[in-house]
Amino acid sequence: EFLGQIVEESLFDMESEGFDIRRSSDEINCRLLADINLCRRVFGNIFSNLLKYADRNRPVTVSYQQRADCLIICFGNYVAEDAQEKESTGIGLKTCAKIIGDHGGSFYSGREAGFFLTKISLPLIVS
């Protein structure tokens, strides 16, 4: 619930900046064991990248999927034409991948045909 609040607050901020956010979600009823400060760092980086690189004329997609053993959060956006020329070291995304990996999860980010996808999978606490 707390993780969802972090994401939704940032999405609200993006909507206030004029972004069209498209959400899709399974019914989420799970618990995660996560360092909330590190998770804030991960999502802070993702939203910073969205604000810098996303095409404001096309929707940003966010989906939440609950599986038997993990929670999957995906962010998708088209890259703005002027953003394609901006330099990036990719260190932020590498740090995100390490943090999520240290939590026992997986992190993917990549671009294909101008569309950028970030996929985070975090293990659930099974009671």
Task: List each model region and its residues.
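Short helix-loop "hinge" at the ATP-lid/N-box region of the Bergerat-fold HATPase_c
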Residues: 50-51
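Glycine-rich/acidic phosphate-handling loop/turn and adjacent ATP-lid/helix
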Residues: 72-90
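A residue-level detector for a conserved hydrophobic packing site
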Residues: 39-43
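Conserved micro-motifs of the catalytic ATP-binding
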Residues: 31-34
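Short conserved segments within the C-terminal catalytic ATPase subdomain
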Residues: 13-23
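Short beta-strand/loop element within the Bergerat-fold HATPase_c
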Residues: 57-69
